[in-house]
Amino acid sequence: MTTGTTPGTTTDAKLTWLLQGLLERTPGARHALVLSRDGLKLCRTPELSVDQADQLAAIAAGIQSLSHGASAEFGDGSGGVRSAMTEFYGGILFIVEAGEGAHLAVIAAEDADAGLVGHTMSELVEQLGEHLRAAPRADDGPRATPAS
């Protein structure tokens, strides 16, 4: 089983197992990833390579950030986003909030049943509860920049 930030822990192994179960129960679902609000991958299904998981985490965090901006400007002012969905040629990206500071992203085939994917994701988020909490990274001050 492949995990994100702390390989080998029981929680991460259980989370990976639950993500894999989501794929098995959801026809057309191809990949699943748990990420932090700031785009760090926390856990992924084995079908995603490390590089793909990094890229998907960055994409999903960016989409969620933009969605929060749209909600703050054009929604009820709370800035809350329940979910985001992006259809592209060859697939659909679903993103839902999943605990404090965490998101669940799923890539599905373009002919997948969006309602079923969303429902399965919601069930998983409810099931996971505390497992999907991801506190924001602390600001450790200025970061070193690479020499030119």
Regions found by a protein language model. Name each.
Residues 2-29, 38-148:
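Acidic, low-complexity cytosolic segments
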